[in-house]
Amino acid sequence: CDVCAISSSEIEVVLKGTLCTLPSSTQIISLNGKSFEEICSEILKLGEQLDAEKEAKQHVDKAIARRNKLDSLPKYSRKILSLEWIDPFFSAGHWVPEQIEIAGFRSAIGQKGEHSRVISIEEIIESDPDDIAVICCGYKLHENKLFAEKLKNNKEINFLRPFKTDNIYSFDSDAYFSRP
């Protein structure tokens, strides 16, 4: 999203503007997939543009096969609240709710393909999550652990079940959730 990543329009302005020495005929390929399917489609398009269609198809086929294996795993009723930011609170969006579903869980806030957005304390409380995933965009595991600790001190939400059951998890966002 444009909160933590440079927008494609900003990139185009810089690359085709006076700040850059690239010729104005340079083709800019913007990738903005918001779901597993869209990301796979964009990989194939990129393969076409780079004359690497065979390699792109191999990567997509491998990803689809891996995903299909996950579909056979048990499904759980647990709701996971994934937070891409904690001040203000941002819900996870784009492909993250789909990742949660593929793993066999339910997204407490956010649906496949929706943009990340600011969420209120009330929405967090109403979502009644079983678990909270701290996946602050652009941060590694050790930094997200610090954010999770800070979250535990937030009196507006630290009475929720995940805090009582110690079901607050931190992840390396760049490795698993940020732009692929």
Task: Give the label of every model feature segment.
Residues 53-105, 176:
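Basic- and aromatic-lined ligand-binding clefts that recognize polyanionic substrates
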Residues 81-83, 135, 171:
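Short hydrophobic segments within beta-strands
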Residues 1-49, 117-159:
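Acidic/His-rich segments in extracytoplasmic proteins that coordinate ligands and/or metal ions
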Residues 108-115:
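Short, solvent-exposed loop/beta-turn-alpha elements that line the ligand-binding surface or hinge
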